[in-house]
Amino acid sequence: MQNLQPFHTFSLPVQAQKIIEITDIEQLKQQWAACQTNKLPVLLLGQGSNVLFLRDFQGVVLLNRLMGIQHTQDADFHYLHVNGGENWHQLVAWSIQQGIFGLENLALIPGCAGSAPIQNIGAYGVEFKDVCDYVEVLNLHTNEIFRLSNEQCQFGYRDSIFKHAYATGYVIIAVGLKLSKNWIPVLKYGSLANLEKSAVNAQQIFDEVCAIRRSKLPDPAEFGNAGSFFKNPVISKVDFDHLQQEYPDIPHFPQADGRVKLAAGWLIDQCGLKGYQLGGAAVHQQQALVLINQQDATSSDVVELAHHIRQKVAQRFAVWLQPEVRFIDEDGEVDSEQAIC
C-alpha cells in the first residue's frame, strides 16, 4: 500500500494499493487497461481538492499530470486549450499576465483544470460554464478522444454530465476556454461590489478575490480541508417565503427558474456550529461551510460531523444540505448524501 495523505487536501490517513503519476495519454490508456485486466478499482485524481476518502482505496490511483497550454485568438476572442493536469489557480494568474481576462473571479479555487468541468466550479458570480468552449474527453473503454460542446456538458449548479453519464471510464484530458476581448468585469458579490466598474481591472479583481478567499478559507497546508463541503441549497419560492417570514435577514439569491438559492454557511452558522468539533474534525471558525482536519482527524470523524451538521440544519430550517465534496470508498465513488444520512 502507498500513502495517499499527500495527494488529497483533507490530508486524512488513508492509503491506496498503488499511486501512479500520468504524464501522457498513452500511459493513461495502458494503466487503465492493466487495472481492468487485473480487476483492480481505479480512481482518476487531479489534486485531490474535492474528495473525501472514506477508507483505504483498494486499487490504483492515477494522478492527472497532463500539462500544457495552447493559446490562439481571433478579432473577438482568446482561445485556450488547457491540458487537464494544469493547476487551475496558476492558469488564472498566467492568463491575466498574458492580458487575457475573464477568469479572475475564479482565482484561488484549488484543483486542476481537468476537474473544473466536473463540479462546474464557480465563485463570485462566474462559473466554469461561462468561459467553457469545449471539454476534451478520453473514452477509456474504446480509447476514442472526443469533444463535448458547452451545451453537451449539461452544466448545472456544481453539476455536469461528468457526474452522471460520463462518470466512469471517461477522463477529461483538456478543456477549451473562450474569453472575450471585450472584457466586462463581474462585480456582483461581496466586497467586489465596492469596486468601481468603470475603473477596475482584472488584476485588481484577482487580488481582491484572493484576499477574500485567504481571509475566509483555511490553508490546506495548515488545516486539511476540501473547500466548501456542502452545496448552497436551492429551494422553491414557496418554501423560501415561509423561511423568510421567520428569518427576515436570511441571505438569498433568486434563480432564473424561479427557485431561490440559500447560503449554506449562514444556515450552519445560525445553528451555532462554527468551531464545533467532533473527534479530530471541526467546522472552521471563519467559514462554516468548510470542514477542517483540526487534529489528526479520521474519515469517520468528518462523516459524523457532516451528518451532525445536516441534521441540525434540517431540524431548524427544514432544508437538507447536500455535500459538494466527492466521497470515495474502498472501490470507488459513492453517493455522498447517502453516506451522511
Swiss-Prot record:
GO biological process: cell division; cell wall organization; peptidoglycan biosynthetic process; regulation of cell shape
Major localisation: cytoplasm
Compartment annotation: Cytoplasm
InterPro entries found in the cross-reference section: FAD-bd_PCMH (IPR016166), FAD-bd_PCMH-like_sf (IPR036318), FAD-bd_PCMH_sub1 (IPR016167), FAD-bd_PCMH_sub2 (IPR016169), MurB (IPR003170), MurB_C (IPR011601), MurB_C_sf (IPR036635), Oxid_FAD_bind_N (IPR006094)
GO molecular function, one term: FAD binding
Top enzyme class: oxidoreductase
Protein family membership: Belongs to the MurB family.
Name the UniProt record assigns to this protein: UDP-N-acetylenolpyruvoylglucosamine reductase
Organism encoding this protein: Pasteurella multocida (strain Pm70)
Organism lineage: Bacteria, Pseudomonadati, Pseudomonadota, Gammaproteobacteria, Pasteurellales
Gene: murB
